[in-house]
Every structure is written in structure tokens, then in C-alpha cells.
Amino acid sequence: MAKEKFERTKPHVNVGTIGHVDHGKTTLTAAIATVLAAKFGGAAKKYDEIDAAPEEKARGITINTAHVEYETANRHYAHVDCPGHADYVKNMITGAAQMDGAILVCSAADGPMPQTREHILLARQVGVPYIIVFLNKCDMVDDAELLELVEMEVRELLSKYEFPGDDTPIIKGSAKLALEGDKGELGEVAIMNLADALDTYIPTPERAVDGTFLMPVEDVFSISGRGTVVTGRIERGVVKVGEEIEIVGIKPTVKTTCTGVEMFRKLLDQGQAGDNVGLLLRGTKREDVERGQVLCKPGSIKPHTHFTGEVYILSKDEGGRHTPFFNNYRPQFYFRTTDVTGSIELPKDKEMVMPGDNVSITVKLIAPIAMEEGLRFAIREGGRTVGAGVVAKILD
């Protein structure tokens, strides 16, 4: 049982550290938690506690992730930090830890490195909306010109991947000094500057209930004398009795009216995000609706078959494929509640994809699925997960 009640007085925001190995992501995570705990309450975290990240499973993929909480004057943050590069790739692609914003940690002594670039690219592909930069290890750089040069390089890199490089907050500091209790500009002051940037630069995310109505169809029943009932968990928004809704995906889009909302055998006048409900649909036949479609606010989402995605292919040890796959590989793509077959086109410079790789692919599905950029999917072969992905760009 939870020991204390979660106080929902402050808005909640999800963030995480990204960046090259050994640039100080975990040290910074510990420093933020420690400095903010002293200022606003909460639990300080030691480096070792964060570094020993527990294993979790997301979509059948094992990921090591550490979760840390902290508060500022205005907000409550949940922060994720991963020990290894592969964990970041998996985490970002599966959306196991959705980030409202990321803190890119870059060592001032080394400047941007290959994983700095790769994490920015991943953030772009998977739809992380905001990046703040913490230029770490500034205590090791005496030359102000060198610092300026590194800052310029980071801004250029962000702009290259369509983040607003020129307007991105860059905080200079030393996570190590801050963690050791240094009260100076590069220590505690830098952490407070970072907290301020988090509060001001990352907007408060829209709550699921404020989104436009969407519910993936899980099951369909026919109730004699009442009509067709569709069950599922409302992903976002609200549906009220009497509202017009659309059935999208797999078949041509049709409109219908919700004439009843039922939860735990009780009739309600509305259902909202997070509710497991049955919706009664007027004049809709049982065979008109199937698992894998979605119910939504009319016009809010369209069905598509052609898209680019960023995918992670499970390694053999993770229960994935034992062999590589090539161009025109045809697995099943599992979106929300159903599998749809599709063919994969690899980038020109990529002859094959090995188990354990991550890669950008182009996919053509044999049936349209209600999708938008940022939608997660699993790649399966005969019901077994062999990969995970996210829709980066819709092409049709």
C-alpha cells in the first residue's frame, strides 16, 4: 500500500535526462533531487540509488529506468534517468516514460558527442516537445571562449533537428559541485536556474481529459432491444450521451450517435479519460464495428496506411528475432488493440536490420488505422513481439 497520500495540489510534469554517456546525467539527476529537496521538501537521492536503476517491462521489452520525484515552488516533477544508451533508445521509442520535456546534459569539457546527437534526433522522432540544456562540468573549463563555442555547437545541433536552438535555455553549471553542497554559481545556483527553466520553458501539459474524445474499440456486443455496445478504455477527452461520434480505421469512416454510457453496470451521462466503459451506439450493427477501430470526436483523427516510424528491434536475449530482416519484411503492426500487416522499407544506406538495432523505417499497412504522429505500436510475428516503434511522420 502507498504510505502517503499523493497531494495533487501542484501541476504534474514528466521530464528526463538525455545525453552522451559519462556527461553527468545521473549526477545531475541526483543534484536536482538533493538541492530541491532541501528547498521545497521531498527526498534527496544519492547517485548510487539512481544508478542502480530497476528493470521494468514496457510492451514486452526490458528497460532499466530510475524514477526520481522532486518539487519546485510551482510544480511536481517525475524525472526518469537511464543507466545505458540502449535503455534510452528503448525508453523513448516505447514511450514507457512519456516526457513533456527533456534535460539534455552535455559536458562543457567534451562538447557534443555521438549520443548527444542521437538523443536529440530520437527526441525529435518520438515527439519530445521541449529540450532544456544543462552544460555540465563547467568547473573543468577555464576558457570562456571554449564555453561559448560548445554552447554554439549545441544550439546548432538542436536547430538541425528542428528544435529552436537559438531560444533554448542553456544553463551552465557543475552537477558534481551542486551535489557536494557548493552554494556558488556553478553549484546550487545553477540547479535553481535549471529548476526555473523547467518551470518557465516547459508548458503545463494538457490533461488527458481535456483532449478530444478518443476510445480504442476492445469489444463489441449486441444487446437485444438496445442495440450495439462497444467497450474500451477512454484514452482522452469526454463523451456525453447524445453526442455524435465517428468510427475510424480498418473500414470506411462512419458517423453514429452515443445513446448511452455504462460503467460497472451503471448508466452515466458521460464517460471520461481513464474510464473503462461500454458505449451504446444508435443504429450501428454489430458487424459495423470491430476491435482495432477507434471511436472519436468527428473529424478529429483520420485513418492512414503510410508512415515513417522510429523502431527498436528486440535482441535475441530479449526474446526477439535471432536473425536480421531485410527490405520488404512483412510483420504485423500492433496499434492500440489490433494487429495489421504491413511492409517495411529500409533507409537507402541500410541493407538489413540486426536484432538489438534501432532504425528509421517507412511502413505501408494493408488496412488503414486511426493514427497521428507520436502513436506507439509493437511489431509482432505470429503474436510474439519482436520490436517497438513510434509514428514519426504520416505520409498519406
Swiss-Prot record:
Keywords, ordered alphabetically: Cytoplasm, Elongation factor, GTP-binding, Hydrolase, Magnesium, Metal-binding, Nucleotide-binding, Protein biosynthesis
Record: residues binding GTP: 19-26, 81-85, 136-139
G4, as annotated region: 136-139
Annotated Mg(2+) binding sites: 26
One CC-aspect GO term: cytoplasm
SUPFAM superfamilies: EF-Tu/eEF-1alpha/eIF2-gamma C-terminal domain, P-loop containing nucleoside triphosphate hydrolases, Translation proteins
Molecular functions (GO terms): GTP binding; GTPase activity; guanosine tetraphosphate binding; translation elongation factor activity
Compartment list: Cytoplasm
Domain tr-type G, chain residue ranges per copy: 10-206
EC number(s) given by UniProt: 3.6.5.3
Record-linked Pfam families: GTP_EFTU, GTP_EFTU_D2, GTP_EFTU_D3
Role description: GTP hydrolase that promotes the GTP-dependent binding of aminoacyl-tRNA to the A-site of ribosomes during protein biosynthesis.
Family: Belongs to the TRAFAC class translation factor GTPase superfamily. Classic translation factor GTPase family. EF-Tu/EF-1A subfamily.
Oligomeric and partner information: Monomer.
Name of this chain's protein: Elongation factor Tu
